[in-house]
Structures are given as structure tokens and as C-alpha cells.
Amino acid sequence: MQNDAGQTVELYVPRKCSSSNRIIGPKDHAAVQIDFVDVDPETGRMIPGKSTRYAICGALRRMGESDDAILRLAQKDGLVPRDELKSN
């Protein structure tokens, strides 16, 4: 498709699930995208460029695996310590 300036633009940019690497289709309305950001402790505002984005497909959400997938990804990226949520 072309815009008014004659440049070719895409209407849909496909995403991949961060956990399963499945392509998230345009009709997957159950898919979510979550951004975790670093916050300045003094101002309470987001620090630009310091964010981590995860996309979770609807299939994982339907199976009830999205919380485990996000926790595993956050632990891999160092957002959550590996032993943080282990029960005794």
C-alpha cells in the first residue's frame, strides 16, 4: 500500500511470541504485549531507552502458561532474580 507521499508502507507488522517463537497473527486478539521499564527513583518517570518488551501469543494465554512464560523470560533477562519466587 502507498501513502499520500507515494511511499510504500505496510499495514501490518508481524510479531513473534517471545516465549514460543510463534508468529502472532493479525486475528490473534488474545495476544498481549507487555513492556517492563526502568523508573527513575527520584522523579518516578520512565527512563528513556530502558525498557524490555515481551509479546505473548493467545495460545499460551489459553493454556494458562503466560505467567510462567513471562517469569522465565524476566529471569533470563535479569529483571527478576532466579530464586525470587521459589517456595520453601
From Swiss-Prot:
Annotated InterPro entries: Ribosomal_eS21, Ribosomal_eS21_CS, Ribosomal_eS21_sf
UniProt keyword annotations, A-Z: Cytoplasm, Endoplasmic reticulum, Ribonucleoprotein, Ribosomal protein
GO cellular component labels: cytosolic small ribosomal subunit; rough endoplasmic reticulum
Annotated GO MF terms: structural constituent of ribosome
GO biological process: endonucleolytic cleavage in ITS1 to separate SSU-rRNA from 5.8S rRNA and LSU-rRNA from tricistronic rRNA transcript (SSU-rRNA, 5.8S rRNA, LSU-rRNA); endonucleolytic cleavage to generate mature 3'-end of SSU-rRNA from (SSU-rRNA, 5.8S rRNA, LSU-rRNA); translation
Record flagged with keyword Cytoplasm: yes
Keyword Cell division belongs to the record: no
Subcellular location: Cytoplasm, Cytosol; Cytoplasm; Rough endoplasmic reticulum
Source species, domain of life: Eukaryota
Subunit structure: Component of the 40S small ribosomal subunit.
Membership in a protein family: Belongs to the eukaryotic ribosomal protein eS21 family.
Protein name: Small ribosomal subunit protein eS21
Species whose genome carries this gene: Caenorhabditis briggsae
UniProt gene name: rps-21
